[in-house]
Amino acid sequence: ACLVGSEMCIRDRYQALYRKWRPKVFSEVVGQEHITDTLRRQVAEGHTAHAYLFTGTRGTGKTTCARILAKAVNCLSPVDGEPCGRCEACRAVDAGTTLDITELDAASNNGVDQVRALREEAVYTPAVLKKRVYIIDEVHMLSTPAFNALLKILEEPPEHLMFILATTELHKVPATILS
């Protein structure tokens, strides 16, 4: 129910705990130090890959690390591989207002048409950020034709492109994608 007067509705002030407390930089991620140290070092040295595959059980930080990596590679003032959180790029990523970072939930968008559309869009250079990043969550849910369509862009990606795939079921990801 809404309060009387100029007070906000309680529902307008509610924020899910996972959103409020989700790590924003690698150093805030708990229990994945070996992974976050590697990612931070790659960003700091400018030696990031064009594709990553994050795997693990639910709640281990795959999507969170993917979002931090996407922010870090686009940060205008990174500090030892960590995103600064203050530059225009970091603020846009945190607010979810940039078109250059796309998250796709493969559990609900698992068809070849969605991946073909992604592939057609991916060839364009980023509108604002340094890199265009696609985070595909639950990638194991893609159909076989969708995996085949994804493979084409993974094999020869443009320089400005990065894919971060996340899965809880690595055994369902085709070997051609894993290589």
Summary of predicted features, one role per range:
Residues 6, 11-179:
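P-loop/Walker A NTP-binding region and its immediately flanking N-terminal helices
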